[in-house]
Amino acid sequence: MRAKARAYTMQALVKYHGLKDWRLRIPYHDSISVNTDVAYVVAEVSFGDSEEDVVMANGTPLTGRAKERVVAVLDRVRELAGIKERAVVRTESHPRVGAKGLGFSSAAGASIALAAYVAAGLDKVYGRDVTLVSRIARLLAGSACRSVVGKYARWYAGTGDHDSYAVRFADERNLPLRFAIVPLGMEATTEEAHREAESSPYFRRRIEVANERCDRVERAIKEGDFRTFGVEVERDSLELHAITMTGSSGMILMSPDTLRVIELVRQMRRSGIEAYFSMQTGPTVYVNTLPEHIDEVAQRLKEAGYEVMVSGVGGGAELVSS
């Protein structure tokens, strides 16, 4: 009872913020992301004779809340499969980057969910049910449900476990996105940011705006309208951080380098390069552009002294040979 799977990290385009159900990880509103093709997590899951679940991430045992989130996935798989065996889970992140906002938790959730699903024999019962795997992955990290399906994905918030999952709605043939990732580190966790969001006086309005923006961004992607896409994703990133900063603790998750990269992107636009910035809950910046501009964008960021990862649109979670 063993399987191995790979899942790519994702760039959240319309970000979710806050959870109305923390156990099931049900968000307040829909969200949209695109998978990368440059960073991923490989997970191996085996069910057997262990006395307890063992979870290793990049060779280090997980404990506490990090382990609990993995066990939530394993428990759901065991429930569906009607088994009681404990599991050994091993994950490896590629590349190893000490930055926040690269989506490795989403890739881990997606790869663990698929590997556990197959290791427990659920594929023989339900077939390769991507929607079910998406729902299972959500229990580890909300965004993992989008990493499962890959390409351009929309997570429908739903009302409970049965209808909160992601659907792929477009791929690079619709919008041939390329993006330069500037990885930047921080200490805070995504969960802290989600809890902080709900105390912002602007949070309720954010829910309304985010659902409306999902419709606009989805339409722009399907129609290949890069300018509308870029403008909406930039605005969403700024709103996301504004919500966090106006919460009860006043969390500031951007760094001075985040602001420098934002200004570099604006300078690029003034010089005629189509480029737009995007951030998730951390300081890492994604610079979205088109194939004809990606080399120039990456070069300018490197000349400014930043490490750069260049990515295109990545696929969904997939099995790999052991």
Residue spans for each PLM region:
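ATP-binding N-lobe of GHMP and related small-molecule kinases
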Residues: M1-K100, Y117-L122, P291, S311-S322
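C-terminal nucleotide
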Residues: R2-W22, I26, G48, D171-S322
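Short beta-strand scaffold segments in enzyme catalytic cores
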Residues: A12-K15, V34, V41-V45, A144-S147, ...
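Short coil/turn connectors at secondary-structure junctions
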Residues: A39, I83-R86, V149-G150, L175-R178, ...
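Short alpha-helix boundary/capping segments
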Residues: L62-R65, G103-F104, Y202-R205
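Charged catalytic carboxylate motif
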Residues: R69, S111, R260
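Charged/polar, low-hydrophobicity segments characteristic of intrinsically disordered regions
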Residues: A72, C145-A157, E212-A220
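Gly/Ser-rich oxyanion-binding loop with an adjacent helix/lid
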Residues: E79-E172
